[in-house]
Structures are given as structure tokens and as C-alpha cells.
């Protein structure tokens, strides 16, 4: 397991119901009622009995179609929504129990947020936009300028400090949004479809940039998208939502290899699994291969040439120089040739 230790966010049986008397309604709700049953009763189940943990340093991607409950769930994590049932802990504190003052402190000091609409202040320069949250914190001009310049450099916008938002491309504006939320050094970073307003090429560039940033900063991230490819590229784990519930929460490898519901399987149908599945996941422990090992972090696609040309049935797999098992070449070839 890559992520150990206590979770940063821990959600247990969380419900968020919209309607006239959600708390009263939830009390009378029979187990097993579907989203449509609840709607027939005049309520909307924005979040339906969700339990999940987000580990420190993990990037959890929440994926689902429009209306599946992604934003509502994330709003519950920061208590922008009061939940109807269940509990949410952030850094070991039950956020439902925090006073308004403590909640504001928590949001201000620990949580960063980036949204699809960049939300920049049009009459402020890049520098002043990025420094804005620091100004809100009462930092002096010199300190906030220094920090703002640091994060502007980090997101690749050095030299554009004095530009106004309208003078920047969409991708650059989103970089300003990212820099602004990084300025306060949040422990937990919520990103709600941050790249969906960008055209496909820029979007890909931003994803790469984002992975580079994350490798450097190691933040705990909850990232919302409705784009499965984006989820597969970025996520340590993906939570797939439907009708307010989490259908499956797993690594990209597991989601494409072992979808647990028909709904998740449908999402994975079109995916080129060879691009997602890693040798480390195919390695069977205790099975001994022969010869030169392949790297656990390599995808099946990256190993394509070797898999086709090699004659070994079992190929050893090594993680950080240690052999962890061996993969069945035929099985990997099946993934490559989409036969699995
Ligand atoms: N304030 C609200 N009042 C009533 N219903 C709401 C409210 N906010 C969200 N909902 C409903 O809750 C459900 C989940 O909405 P949510 O915005 O979380 O979905 P989403 O997956 O984030 O969608 P999108 O990708 O379109 O942003 C939807 O049926 C929505 O209509």
C-alpha cells in the first residue's frame, strides 16, 4: 500500500439530502432506497451513504456524470454544506462539531480551492490576484509579494506578474487560479473541474504541469472531473459516483481491470487498458520469473516491444530494485491486444 497512516479526510455514511425536512426524512428512510425512490418522495439525494478516506499526500479523483454528486460531496468535506447524516473528520476533527470561528480558520489555513471558472479579479494584476488571499490574512506587502512571486514562478508564469487576467489565455488564467490557492500553502487542495474550460491541448499540458507540481509538493488532493481519461492520468485512486453514491473507489489499475459494478465496467469499456495497467499490479507475488526484471512502474503499453519479442512465460517485476514477483507474459499480451 502506497499510502499509510491516518487519513486526512475520513467520511462515514455521509448523506446530503435536499428538500423540506431532510433530517426528519433521513430518520424515516428505509435501507436500500434508490435515488429515484427518494426523488419520488420529493427529496434529492445529493450524497447517498458515502464512506471513504483520503490519505495524506494522495490524489483522489472524484469522477461521475453531471449531477452524480461530485461537487456536493466535496462541499461536504469543507462543510460548505451541512451534512444530513453520517460524519466527516478532517485531520482528526469532526468538522460538524467545529464552531464557526474554528471552521473559518480550518478553511483559511488548511484548505485551498480551485474552480472551473477561474474566479480572478479582473482589475488586479496577476501578482495582486495571487497575493489576494495573503492580503486577507493580513500579511504585509513585502511578505505577500515575496510569496506570490514564488508561486507564480512555480506555475510557470514568471514574467507575467503585471499582466491583467484579460491579457492571458485560459490556461494561463487557470495557472493564476492555481498559484493563488497555493499561495496560502494549503494541506488539502480541492479542485472542482479546474481544466474543463480549457481546450484539449492546453488541458493536457495543464495535467502534466499539475502532475509535476504534485510530485514536488505532495499535497492531499481531491480533484473533481467528469472526464475519465483525466481521472486515469491524474489519480492515485478514483471514486466513481452515480446518483449520489460511490460505485467504486479504487486505483486506476483496479478500476479498469476489476470493475465491481456494471456501471463502472461501462466506463472502462472504451479505455485502452494497456495505457493504465502497470507491471507492478500484474506481478504475482511468490511466482519466480527468470532473467532481467521489468520495472513495476512501467505500463503494459511501455513494455509492448518487450512483451512481443520476449520468449519468457514469466517475467520478473522489480520495484525499487527489489523483485516483487513475476508477470504472466501472455496475460500482459492479452491486455495489450485488448483480448482481456
Ligand atoms: N442546493 C441544492 N438544492 C437542491 N438540489 C441540489 C443542490 N445542489 C445540488 N443539488 C442536486 O444534487 C445532485 C448532485 O449535484 P452536484 O452538483 O453535486 O453534481 P455534480 O456531479 O457535481 O454535477 P456537475 O458535474 O454538473 O457539476 C443533483 O441532482 C443536483 O440537482
Swiss-Prot record:
Expression induction per the record is: Expression is induced by TMAO.
Q: Which SUPFAM superfamilies match?
A: P-loop containing nucleoside triphosphate hydrolases
Asked if ATP-binding is a keyword of the record, the answer is yes
Where does this protein reside within or beyond the cell?
Cell inner membrane
Q: Which GO terms describe its molecular function?
A: ABC-type quaternary ammonium compound transporting activity; ATP binding; ATP hydrolysis activity
Highest taxon above the source species: Bacteria
Cross-referenced Pfam families:
ABC_tran (PF00005)
Enzyme Commission number, as recorded = 7.6.2.9
The ABC transporter domain, residue ranges: 32-268
Q: Which InterPro entries match?
A: AAA+_ATPase, ABC_osmolyte_uptake_ATP-bind, ABC_transporter-like_ATP-bd, ABC_transporter-like_CS, Gly-betaine_transp_ATP-bd, P-loop_NTPase
Top-level EC class as recorded in UniProt: translocase
As for membrane topology, the entry says: Peripheral membrane protein
Coiled coil segments of this chain: none
This protein's record includes keyword Protease: no
Q: Which UniProt keywords apply?
A: ATP-binding, Cell inner membrane, Cell membrane, Membrane, Nucleotide-binding, Translocase, Transport
A Gene Ontology cellular component where this protein is annotated is: plasma membrane
Family membership noted in the UniProt record:
Belongs to the ABC transporter superfamily.
Mind telling me which NCBIfam families this protein's record contains? proV (TIGR01186)
Give the protein's function: Part of the ABC transporter complex TmoXWV involved in trimethylamine N-oxide (TMAO) import. Responsible for energy coupling to the transport system. Is specific for TMAO and essential for TMAO metabolism.
This chain's protein is named Trimethylamine N-oxide transport system ATP-binding protein TmoW
Species of provenance? Ruegeria pomeroyi (strain ATCC 700808 / DSM 15171 / DSS-3)
Q: Which gene encodes it?
A: tmoW
Amino acid at each position: 500500500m502506497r499510502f499509510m497512516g491516518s487519513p486526512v479526510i475520513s467520511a462515514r455514511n455521509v448523506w446530503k439530502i435536499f428538500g423540506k425536512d431532510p433530517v426528519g426524512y433521513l430518520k424515516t428512510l428505509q435501507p436500500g432506497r434508490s435515488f429515484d425512490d427518494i426523488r419520488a418522495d420529493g427529496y434529492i439525494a445529493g450524497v447517498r451513504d458515502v464512506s471513504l478516506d483520503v490519505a495524506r499526500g494522495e490524489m483522489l479523483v472524484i469522477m461521475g456524470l453531471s449531477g452524480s454528486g461530485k461537487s456536493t460531496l466535496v462541499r461536504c468535506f469543507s462543510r460548505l454544506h451541512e451534512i444530513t447524516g453520517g460524519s466527516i473528520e478532517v485531520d482528526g476533527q469532526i468538522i460538524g462539531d467545529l464552531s464557526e470561528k474554528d471552521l473559518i480558520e480550518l478553511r483559511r489555513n488548511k484548505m485551498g480551492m480551485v474552480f472551473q471558472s477561474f474566479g480572478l479579479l479582473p482589475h488586479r494584476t496577476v501578482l495582486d490576484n495571487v497575493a489576494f488571499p495573503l492580503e486577507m490574512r493580513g500579511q504585509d506587502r513585502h511578505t505577500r509579494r515575496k510569496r506570490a512571486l514564488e508561486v507564480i514562478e512555480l506555475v510557470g508564469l514568471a514574467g507575467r506578474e503585471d499582466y491583467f487576467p484579460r491579457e492571458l489565455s485560459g490556461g494561463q488564467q487557470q495557472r493564476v487560479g492555481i498559484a493563488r490557492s497555493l499561495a496560502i500553502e494549503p494541506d488539502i487542495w480541492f479542485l472542482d473541474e479546474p481544466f474543463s474550460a480549457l481546450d484539449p491541448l492546453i488541458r493536457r499540458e495543464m495535467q502534466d504541469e499539475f502532475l509535476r507540481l504534485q510530485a514536488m509538493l505532495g499535497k492531499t488532493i481531491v480533484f473533481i472531473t467528469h472526464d475519465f481519461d483525466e481521472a486515469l492520468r491524474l489519480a492515485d485512486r478514483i471514486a466513481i459516483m452515480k446518483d449520489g453514491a460511490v460505485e467504486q473507489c479504487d486505483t486506476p489499475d483496479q478500476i479498469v481491470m476489476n470493475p465491481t459494478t456494471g456501471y463502472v465496467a461501462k466506463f472502462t469499456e472504451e479505455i485502452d487498458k494497456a495505457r493504465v495497467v502497470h507491471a507492478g499490479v500484474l506481478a504475482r507475488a511468490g511466482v519466480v520469473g527468470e532473467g532481467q526484471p521489468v520495472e513495476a512502474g512501467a505500463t503494459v503499453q511501455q513494455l509492448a516491444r518487450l512483451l512481443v519479442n520476449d520468449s519468457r512465460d514469466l517475467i520478473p517485476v522489480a520495484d525499487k530494485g527489489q523483485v516483487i514477483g513475476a508477470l504472466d507474459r501472455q496475460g500482459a499480451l492479452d491486455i495489450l491486444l485488448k483480448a482481456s
